[in-house]
Amino acid sequence: MEKYIILILSYVIGSIPFSLIIAKINGINLREVGSGNIGATNVARTGNKRLAVLALFLDSLKGFVAVYTAQQFCDNNDLYIYVSAILAVLGHMFPIWLRFNGGKGVATTLGVLIALNISIALAFVFVWLIVFFIFRYSSLASLAATAAAVIASFFFQKELFLILLTVAILIFLKHYKNIANLLQGRERKFL
């Protein structure tokens, strides 16, 4: 029974819209700024770097907390840990509090990766930074980092492959407009 509670908790934790809350406290409506997304990247588009870093930290932290909590109650490699990881990301993407209209799940995925395998998390961050600084597209960096995490799972922890592939599919689906804009040369660079 407690494992089912952990799964529900993972979704609920993932559903906390920290970026939206932080922005609102500071008089910013993220739905009306930049891309309209409620994630940390859109907080960065407001020009407030301090808020952006805080949003990134808190959105990542909720992914970490959800998985870490599951790890405390489950055996290593227990399916419940992996399902809690997916549910935390789904919570961010489809939060119950916002009529299931949330962010894209990238920062929350980083937190999940830190809890599951730090080597994969580092590969994720490394690829994100490299792609971002070369191309200046947050969306492209996020997609590349997500793909890199799936590939890295082959080298560092094969049992994470299907979980990370599932998360990657979700992230790619949430980025479908960005992908179309990238292909058409209309995606906005992050300056």
UniProtKB/Swiss-Prot annotation:
Transmembrane segments: 5-25, 51-71, 78-98, 114-134, 153-173
Membrane topology: Multi-pass membrane protein
One GO term describing the cellular component: plasma membrane
Enzyme Commission number(s) from the entry: 2.3.1.275
Oligomer status and interactors: Probably interacts with PlsX.
Gene (name only): plsY
Catalysed reactions, as listed in the record: an acyl phosphate + sn-glycerol 3-phosphate = a 1-acyl-sn-glycero-3-phosphate + phosphate
The organism's taxonomic lineage, starting at the top: Bacteria, Pseudomonadati, Pseudomonadota, Alphaproteobacteria, Rickettsiales
Function (record text): Catalyzes the transfer of an acyl group from acyl-phosphate (acyl-PO(4)) to glycerol-3-phosphate (G3P) to form lysophosphatidic acid (LPA). This enzyme utilizes acyl-phosphate as fatty acyl donor, but not acyl-CoA or acyl-ACP.
InterPro entries named in the record: G3P_acylTferase_PlsY
Keywords assigned by UniProt, alphabetized: Cell membrane, Lipid biosynthesis, Lipid metabolism, Membrane, Phospholipid biosynthesis, Phospholipid metabolism, Transferase, Transmembrane, Transmembrane helix
Annotated localization: Cell membrane
Domain of life: Bacteria
One GO biological process term: phospholipid biosynthetic process
Main subcellular location of this protein, as a coarse class: membrane
Family: Belongs to the PlsY family.
Pathway annotation from the record: Lipid metabolism; phospholipid metabolism
GO molecular function: acyl-phosphate glycerol-3-phosphate acyltransferase activity
SMART domains found in the cross-reference section: G3P_acyltransf (SM01207)
Protein name stated in the entry: Glycerol-3-phosphate acyltransferase
Pfam families: G3P_acyltransf
